[in-house]
């Protein structure tokens, strides 16, 4: 009986791990736009300095790696990481894409998250800015509360 109980507990535990949402961070803007258009979810542009920005690392540690955030993100947005690393090499195309988007959205500090909806017309993309936010203390609940206020404008 004890053996059966242990097997049941292990099976239920593994099932819980399998159901946890796995975050998918896109770096290919065109792919993310296509997903956003198909799912009718806004884009979540995360402007970060992943290997040097302390506040970016803190936001990731306190919010983005938490199961509550993963569940919220899967339901509400298409995640796009726009990284500006100093020590980690990235392709020239990715550097150019990230730099152009940073200029387009007037990013002056990190971390910055922009919520936008893409509008594709005749092969051209325009972004409708919904709003932005940076680091918010209080974990996933506080951060997603601010994000939800922005998303209500869509």
Name the predicted role of every residue range.
Residues 50-53, 63, 84-89, 108, ...:
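Solvent-exposed loop/turn segments at secondary-structure junctions
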Residues 39-53:
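Short active-site neighborhood of thiol/selenol oxidoreductases, capturing the structured segment around
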Residues 14-20:
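Sec/Tat signal peptide C-region and signal peptidase I cleavage site
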Residues 23-26, 48, 69-96:
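Thiol-based oxidoreductase modules, predominantly thioredoxin-like and allied folds used
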Residues 25-43, 73:
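A short beta-strand-turn-helix
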Residues 62-64, 100-154:
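Non-catalytic, surface beta->alpha helical segment in thiol-disulfide oxidoreductase systems
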Residues 55-74:
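Typically the conserved alpha-helix immediately C-terminal to a functionally engaged Cys/Sec
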Residues 4-13:
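Sec-dependent N-terminal signal peptides
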């Amino acid at each position: 009986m004890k053996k059966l109980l242990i097997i049941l507990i292990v099976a239920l535990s593994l099932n819980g791990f399998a159901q946890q949402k796995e975050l998918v961070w896109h770096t290919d803007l065109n792919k993310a736009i296509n997903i956003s258009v198909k799912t009718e979810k806004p884009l979540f542009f995360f402007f970060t300095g992943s290997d040097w920005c302390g506040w970016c690392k803190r936001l990731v540690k306190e919010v983005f790696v938490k199961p509550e955030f993963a569940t919220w993100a899967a339901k509400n947005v298409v995640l796009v990481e726009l990284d500006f690393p100093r020590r980690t090499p990235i392709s020239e195309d990715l550097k150019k894409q990230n730099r152009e988007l940073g200029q387009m959205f007037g990013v002056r500090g990190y971390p910055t998250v922009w919520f936008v909806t893409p509008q594709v017309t005749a092969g051209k993309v325009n972004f409708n800015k919904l709003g932005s936010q940076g680091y918010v203390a209080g974990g996933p609940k506080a951060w997603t509360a601010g994000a939800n206020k922005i998303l209500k404008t869509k």
